[in-house]
Amino acid sequence: MINDDSFTLKRKYQIDSAESTMKMDKTMTKFQNRVKMVKEINQTIRAAQTHYETLKLGYIKFKGMIRTTTLEDIAPSIPNNQKTYKLFSDISVIGKASQNPSKMIYARCFTCFPICLEMTIDSFVIECIQHCS
């Protein structure tokens, strides 16, 4: 049997060596970074989903309000009738031109209620929902 070091089998990294510890730490760090990134993405998705649900509920309430309100309720005089007709035509134009539902809701709300431009859309929708309930 040969006892020469060149003929013995050696591991690439020793089990308790600093190199193996560094390699494991590097792998753990990569994994932790991935976990952190996935958590952030999921948090963003949850926030966007909540935002979308709020907008959707506001749109449904707004649409119901428009359907149930008659012209006599809104505008008893001739100038107000013209304003109401313009408002409804603006709403239909916005609906046809919108690229996605959220842009449609923003545009409709800001067209119908320009006073609320300084409010955030979430607080505005919540206020509309409370008012309609």
From Swiss-Prot:
- Location(s) in or outside the cell: Host cytoplasm
Gene Ontology terms: cellular component = host cell cytoplasm
Sorted keywords for this record are: Early protein, Host cytoplasm, Repeat
Q: What does this protein do?
A: Major early protein present in virus factories. The presence of BEN domains suggests a possible role in organization of viral DNA during replication or transcription.
Q: Which family does it belong to?
A: Belongs to the orthopoxvirus OPG067 family.
Protein name per the record: Protein OPG067
Q: Which organism is it from?
A: Monkeypox virus
Gene name of this polypeptide: OPG067
